[in-house]
């Protein structure tokens, strides 16, 4: 499987600058499933592949070639907090669903927050120090690609993550591994909020699960 940027993407001959896919096919003597996308940023095409029906976590590819320009950084924690749950197959392949909720979102203004998941009151669970736990978020309107997910803990700390998916990459499904930052250790997860960067002009439905 080949993922990457416009340098590796399948294009018409007139627009093609390189033939990396053809080079791999010729010298490896294998067929190549090319998911590289122009304008998908550094991990967009890999996310596109992992979320597709071509990827099976029970029968993963023997090799993924991930082409990246030298100026792209692989140090951003959010990259791996999204990729690891996707590689493992999400909640469908998770042994335990800790919490779940579905919310019908009304029209929302920019920076207006809405709670997706609550862990308070009589139904409060012990959701502290969850190793490899992650959120699976499904948004019915696949055009919603620019928003924050904010996780609050009972010690006052919070984890605010910005999702900004490029237009060429499909929306609708998002993963977020819970933060392992020191400030959240020993704290119980209280709630998960969504905050759109751009106004939501039409109602949409969001389903969220906490799995591990």
Where do the language-model regions lie?
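Extracellular glycan-modifying ectodomains
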Residues: 1-212
């Amino acid at each position: 499987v080949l993922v990457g940027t416009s340098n590796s993407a399948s294009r018409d001959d007139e627009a093609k600058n390189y033939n990396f896919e053809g080079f791999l096919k010729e010298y490896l003597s294998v067929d190549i499933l090319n998911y590289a996308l122009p304008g998908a940023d550094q991990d967009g095409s890999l996310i596109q592949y992992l979320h597709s029906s071509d990827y099976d976590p029970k029968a993963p590819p023997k090799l993924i070639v991930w082409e990246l320009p030298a100026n792209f950084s692989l140090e951003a924690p959010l990259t791996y907090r999204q990729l690891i749950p996707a590689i493992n197959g999400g909640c469908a392949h998770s042994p335990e669903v800790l919490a779940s909720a579905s919310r019908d979102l009304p029209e929302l203004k920019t920076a207006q927050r809405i709670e997706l998941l609550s862990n308070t009151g009589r139904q409060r669970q012990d959701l502290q120090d969850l190793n490899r736990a992650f959120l699976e978020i499904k948004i019915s309107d696949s055009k919603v690609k620019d928003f924050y997910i904010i996780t609050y803990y009972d010690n006052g700390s919070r984890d605010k993550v910005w999702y900004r998916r490029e237009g060429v990459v499909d929306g609708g499904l998002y993963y977020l591994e819970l933060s392992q930052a020191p400030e959240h250790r020993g704290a119980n997860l209280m709630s998960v909020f969504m905050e759109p960067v751009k106004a939501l002009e039409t109602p949409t439905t969001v389903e969220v699960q906490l799995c591990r």
